[in-house]
Every structure is written in structure tokens, then in C-alpha cells.
């Protein structure tokens, strides 16, 4: 059994989780046969990590997030295969939609002024190669975003977060790895989770 991965990234409140659910429905119920027998969604950080941090009363670090992803992959029964690794003529059995992955880890670490430990850099690079591609949902009007995890109106700055994502995407262009990241502009006045998911599904057909 093999698996393929795609990631959904973007600022808090842009709608990643809702879009992931819609995308799963589209891929499983499209008229033409989907190449995947199963489509699954995995949210990061995992509930286990979030609960442990809450019980310990501590904030999660970039290293915590990376270990969380690495541990999840380690306990999966399917082998992890890089998208650019030649394989036999066997179609992937399962598609995993990753709700957040390494891009968010790097973005939020930068916003916290946190340096990713040198020992974690190889893990960051390895995990970054797992998804076939990463769809980055970018809000057209970031100032309208809200996050239920930040009840204090001063606790979440969506414009600063969006700017951080834009900087990382710009760096991806410079480093010639932009093909790994596909920006999707989200216009809250016109777009719906379904229409965004449909756009992603169409982009996936071309991959």
C-alpha cells in the first residue's frame, strides 16, 4: 500500500480545514474515477500534541511541530515515498490531505522570533519533500480574518501572518522550488470552500 500527500497551508482563519473536507468529498465522489481508493485528512499539530501542551501549560515550539509530523509518519503502515522517487507501475492507494505542514511551522517560528534548532534543519528539509505539492490559501483581504483560538482581538494579527507567508513564498521563487507551492487567492466575497476545493482538484489533475 502506497500513499500520496498534498498539503494545505495559509494563515489562521483562511478556511483550510473546511476546504480540506470539501476537497475530500470532491475527490471521492467525482464522476470520473479517482486514482485513490481512500482520501484522508490529517490535521497538525495532532490532537495528542495539542492536548499534552495544554496539560503541561506550555507553548509549542517549531521542534515540537516537526517531531509531531515525523512521529505520525513513523507510525503509519504505508511506506513514505518522495514524489520525485521513481516507482513501479503501482498507483498510490491513499491520498492524505495534510492540514498544515512544514511551511506553517517555519512561518510561525519566524513570527515568534524563534530560531529552528540546527539539529532540526535536516528534519525540516526531509518533511518538506513529502507532499507532492502544497496549496497555500492566501486571503485577498487578510484584515478580515479571525481565529477562534485568539479570543483577544489583539492576540492575532492576520495581516502580519499573511505578510510572513508571502515572504516565504517569495523565498521559494528565489530558491527555484516554487513548483512545490501553489498559491490560491481566497476572495471571501466571491469564493466558497467548495469553489476553492474545486480549483485545487483541477490543479491536482495537471500534476
What are these regions (language model features)?
Residues 14:
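ATP-binding Walker
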Residues 60-128:
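Glycine-rich phosphate-binding loop used to anchor ATP phosphates in small-molecule kinases
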Residues 21-78:
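Conserved substrate/cofactor phosphate-moiety recognition/catalytic segment
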Residues 17:
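Walker A/P-loop
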Residues 8:
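Hydrophobic anchor at the beta1->P-loop junction of P-loop NTPases
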Residues 108-173:
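A glycine- and Lys/Arg-enriched "phosphate-lid" helix/loop adjacent to the NTP-binding pocket
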Residues 11:
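P-loop (Walker A) phosphate-binding loop of NTP-binding proteins
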Residues 150-207:
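NTP-dependent small-molecule kinase module
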Amino acid at each position: 500500500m502506497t500513499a500520496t500527500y498534498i498539503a494545505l497551508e495559509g494563515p489562521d482563519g483562511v478556511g483550510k480545514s473546511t476546504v480540506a473536507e470539501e476537497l475530500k468529498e470532491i475527490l471521492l465522489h467525482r464522476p470520473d474515477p479517482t486514482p485513490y481508493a481512500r482520501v484522508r485528512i490529517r490535521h497538525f499539530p495532532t490532537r495528542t500534541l495539542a492536548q499534552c501542551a495544554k496539560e503541561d501549560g506550555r507553548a509549542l515550539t517549531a521542534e515540537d511541530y516537526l517531531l509531531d509530523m515525523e512521529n505520525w509518519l513513523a507510525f503509519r503502515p504505508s511506506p513514505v515515498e518522495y514524489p520525485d522517487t521513481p516507482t513501479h507501475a503501482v498507483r498510490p492507494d491513499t491520498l492524505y490531505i495534510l492540514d498544515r505542514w512544514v511551511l506553517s511551522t517555519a512561518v510561525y517560528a519566524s513570527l515568534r522570533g524563534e530560531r529552528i534548532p540546527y539539529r532540526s534543519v535536516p528534519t525540516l528539509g526531509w518533511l518538506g519533500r513529502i507532499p507532492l505539492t502544497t496549496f497555500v490559501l492566501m486571503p485577498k483581504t487578510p484584515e478580515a480574518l479571525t481565529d477562534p483560538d485568539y479570543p483577544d482581538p489583539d492576540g492575532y494579527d492576520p495581516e502580519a501572518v499573511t505578510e510572513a507567508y508571502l515572504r516565504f513564498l517569495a523565498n521559494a521563487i528565489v530558491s527555484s522550488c516554487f513548483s512545490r507551492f501553489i498559491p490560491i487567492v481566497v476572495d471571501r466575497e466571491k469564493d466558497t470552500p467548495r469553489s476553492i476545493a474545486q480549483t485545487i482538484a483541477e490543479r491536482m489533475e495537471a500534476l
